[in-house]
Design a protein with these regions (language model features):
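SAM-dependent transferase fold signal centered on methyltransferase-like domains
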Residues: 1-201
């Protein structure tokens, strides 16, 4: 995000996004892609400022599309997960369903080697940008959980934990309830998860 775009985001943080979207002609200096990104950043901040009270105050923090903002963990939830995981004797952590990266970010405060895995290009780029602002030691992998597992962790290291929070929606967007219908398929991956790590959650 350029400094000019960042300034515009800050200037309009409290504006009505729907009204701002109708004022495209006021910003001829912005490409259509930049204008959409401007709206996305303002909308994301407004939707997550209560859920992410600390992160939302960081200059140049970036926000993904609406659904990802709605589905991400709150800071409180991510900190609680991190506290629980920090009590395990591990030094390597891999989040195979990285998403917006909030869980990964807080867990990385307790573990020296952290892998964030996300197949969505835009989410991955935003997470990488945000990690660089807070915890640059997080290793980012723009790939699927399956592909990452194929190449990572040759054996079940005693100090490795693999974490997954699969999408509970089908490719068509409808809700699913069985583990084998989630994406990625935990049931199918479970033998590999057990082979490659001491802990799975």
């Amino acid at each position: 995000m350029t400094s000019d775009l960042s300034t515009l985001v800050f200037k309009h943080l409290h504006d009505d996004v729907q009204q701002l979207a109708l004022q495209r002609n006021r910003y001829p200096q912005l490409s259509d892609a930049d204008f959409r990104f401007l709206l996305q950043q303002i909308d994301g901040w407004q939707r997550t400022k209560s859920k992410l009270p600390t992160l939302s105050q960081i200059p140049n923090w970036q926000y993904p599309v609406r659904l990802s903002c709605e589905q991400c963990s709150s800071e409180a939830t991510a900190k609680y997960k991190a506290l629980l995981i920090s009590q395990l004797p591990i030094n390597t952590f891999a989040d195979l369903t990285g998403g917006y990266g909030i869980d990964t970010l807080y867990i990385s405060e307790h573990i020296p080697t952290v892998h964030y895995v996300e197949r969505n290009n835009e989410l991955c780029a935003i997470a990488q940008h945000n990690f660089a602002l807070q915890h640059p030691h997080i290793q980012v992998h723009n790939t699927t959980a399956e592909s990452f597992l194929d190449s990572a962790f040759s054996s079940a290291a005693e100090t490795t934990l693999i974490y997954m929070d699969p999408a509970r929606r089908s490719s068509s967007g409808s809700k699913v309830f069985r583990l084998e219908d989630c994406e990625p398929n935990i049931v199918e991956l479970l033998p590999t998860l057990r082979l490659k790590s001491r802990y799975q959650c």
